[in-house]
Amino acid sequence: MRKMNISKCLVGIAVLLAAPMIVLAQQTETHIGKVTGHEGAGRQLYFRYCWGCHGFRGNGNGENWIPTGSFPDSPYLNVEPRNFVAATFECRSTPTGTLPTDEDLYNSLVRGLVNSNMPSWVTLTTQNRADLVAFIKTFSARWKTEKAGTPITVPPEPALTVQSIQHGKELFTKLECWKCHGPEGLGDGPSASTLTDSNDEPIRPYNFSAGYRFKCGTSNHDLYKIFMTGLDGTPMPSFADVIKPDDAWDLVHYLRTLQVYHKSPELALWMGTKEGAEIVKAEKVRGTPTGSGVNQ
């Protein structure tokens, strides 16, 4: 009898000793290059830097959150913090409707989200950012049942030509981009005032004349990804099933010409044509609409 009790005690002690190892094994980890992010360390960082906007539970309603519409003339204050519970992310390299990769989340921390209150966290270490990614993924059950999508393939950018810009202009009309973004890309299309996000909150189309940076990056490569993956949670869809990959580059080239206040190879080439020069001149005369925002 005594031997049996001793055996039970030994088993109990073994279970207790193993418990921390079991908990540790259940911790979420991320892998960014050669760096492994850990949920526990990320939790401490989140409640130091992030919860004020994203909330104690990660649902995007922290004490610093400003309700949509509070400042109608400020596109920057009208961008809601990301709801990590919903796990719907705009900036991804993966197809629409899928979860982003760890690298996608990490890149958002490095880059920040342009035209929003989300800053770049480049001041943190690589390890810190990897840890934050690990903790952010604990808020939604989606990460337990779904895998991240497979990043889309971005073909090499073809040579910039007047023909590619002209074809992009035709696609802009054919795909009805103008209905939201307006014929000159000023964010004032006929549908602009009716747009809402996944929370049924008003959202503004991107105004190309307002700058050269996009929420998810600044390069042509970034713009291509936005067009082919869409911005989930917003009215901006993916056109991956509508347009050929190489043709998408033509649209990228044309969209750059709509950024009339930013010098770019695309704008310079377009200005060299009679049609392009007249269009750009007219856009500059018209100017940026008052209060036109860049939520998307």
What name fits each language-model region?
Residues 59-60, 186-187, 245:
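Short, non-ligating residues that shape and space the ligands of small metal-coordination modules
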